[in-house]
Design a protein with these regions (language model features):
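Glycine-rich phosphate/adenosyl-contacting loop at the front of the ribokinase-like
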Residues: 1-57, 64-68, 235
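Hydrophobic anchor at the start of a short beta-strand
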Residues: 3, 53-54, 80-81, 149-150, ...
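Active-site metal-binding loops of divalent metal-dependent hydrolases
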Residues: 9, 133, 244
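Short, acidic/turn-prone active-site loops that include or flank metal/cofactor-
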Residues: 10, 31-34, 112-113, 154-158, ...
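Conserved N-terminal subdomain of the carbohydrate kinase-like
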Residues: 23-27, 34, 49-127, 290-304
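Structural alpha-helical scaffold elements that stabilize or flank donor/cofactor-binding regions
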Residues: 120-121, 164, 171, 201
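Conserved beta-alpha-beta core of the PfkB/ribokinase-like small-molecule kinase fold
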Residues: 126-193, 215-217
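Conserved phosphate-binding/catalytic region of the ribokinase-like
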Residues: 184, 188-304
Length: 304
């Protein structure tokens, strides 16, 4: 039994600053983190930490950052045999500015100089999670194992995420993706419009959920749409919360949880993650997420 995560792999350097980033000054900071980044990579770190045999299919450069990424992933028990090092290439990197006053962040990404290539795949896997990067590899993985449940972390509307949204079992998208695809922002106070928006998303995949940050999430099941509030926590950093959400959701699906229960577990894991700084460094223990889910179970509310 194993999980295959397919997508972006990079190196994050995180600086924490008070307030917004002003122009034309020099700041001295005392907090710095360097970690593997990328939605699929962070999700793989979670499923590996939670004890599932986990494969990551991705690309890195031929540099010191690639070595640091792979070393850290091994600490999370992630199998990196299918992460390809591209000779002479630079790894993807992100400079992340964490705004201490409001727990938000600003990320500046350098995609690296990685050539496109179809990646090798493990011979067997039981759940697929893709973030829209490495499109051809994701399509190949689903074609090879058509009965394996697949999850799309759809953060934004791109050609790749639109194509994959119509192929996967579970479309778990951000409100940015949903709003862009539907042509208008998702609002919980306009049920008529929301009904149409969910129907539009639902036409692409059998299962649909939209994450709404502090407002929780909405999902469709058996013709009804439900709202699941977020767990009440004090947020200090939102970096990686969505990736951790998707990784723990994939874990729940792997473990045979129902769609709503997997979303509850994912919400609990994401809530715990924002109480710490960093992406993979904020992944909670599985027992912590399970306890929060059971002891503070958020009641879903039927919207229509």
């Amino acid at each position: 039994m194993s999980v295959l995560c397919i997508g972006q792999c990079g190196y994050d350097i995180i600086f924490s600053i008070p307030g917004l980033l002003p122009e034309n000054i020099k700041l001295r900071i005392t907090d710095k983190l360097e970690l593997p980044g990328g939605p699929a990579t962070c999700a793989a770190a979670l499923t590996g930490k939670w004890g599932l045999p986990t494969y990551l299919a991705s690309r890195v450069g031929d540099d010191i950052f690639a070595d640091a990424i792979l070393d850290k992933l091994h600490q999370f028990q992630v199998n990196t045999d299918y992460v390809q090092k591209i000779p002479g290439a630079n790894s993807s990197m992100s400079m992340v500015i964490r705004h201490c006053d409001n727990a938000n962040r600003t990320a500046i990404n350098y995609p690296g100089t990685l050539i496109d290539m179809e990646l090798p795949l493990p011979p067997h896997y039981d759940v697929i999670l893709t973030d829209g990067h490495e499109l051809n590899t994701a399509l190949d993985a689903m074609q090879r194992a058509p009965h394996v449940p697949s999850v799309l972390d759809a953060g934004s509307v791109r050609d790749s995420t639109l194509l994959l949204a119509k192929k996967v079992t579970y479309l778990v998208c951000s409100e940015v993706f949903a709003g862009s695809y539907c042509g208008e922002a998702i609002r919980l106070d306009d049920l008529d419009k929301l009904r149409s928006q969910i129907a539009s998303l639902r036409s692409m995949a059998p299962y649909v959920a939209v994450t709404l940050g502090e407002q929780g999430l909405i999902y469709e099941e058996n013709g009804h749409v439900f709202h699941l509030p977020a767990f009440p926590v004090e947020s200090v950093d939102t970096l990686g919360a969505g990736d951790i959400f998707h990784g723990s959701f994939a874990y729940g699906i792997h473990e045979g949880m129902s769609f709503p229960d997997a979303l509850q577990l994912a919400s609990a894991a994401a809530a715990l993650s924002v109480t710490k700084v960093g992406g993979v460094s904020s992944i909670p223990d599985r027992d912590q997420a399970t306890i929060l889910m059971k002891n503070n179970c958020q009641k879903n509310r039927i919207l229509f």
